[in-house]
Amino acid sequence: MKVIFPGSFDPITNGHMDLISRASKLFDQVVVVISNNTSKHSLFTPEEKDHLVTEALSKFSNVSVELIQTDLTINVVKKFNADAIIRGIRNTRDFTYEQEIALMNKKLDSDIETITLFSNPEVSFI
């Protein structure tokens, strides 16, 4: 199964790394998609984020990194022929937010699933 893990990764955190590590053990292929979040002020340029994330994830043989700034996540899932989107959940606020996004994605394409992984408490706020 191939999954997409989208995010702004500005910067990539220990929480992201933990989730990606766990996902790499559960799924055949994980595509980390660096996207633009217009509601956040970026610390790094897209190219810098791409370099940092690619370097951080180089030890995972089944994880790839893609820089896609201007497309809906659901379209990226289709572009990479992925089976699902993975998201991390730290708390109830994250759950509510991710549920709303998952429901919208389901309306856009009923075949795409969203799979959530609960954050490891040791890295959920790092």
Predicted feature residues:
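Nucleotidyltransferase catalytic core that binds NTPs
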Residues: 1-126
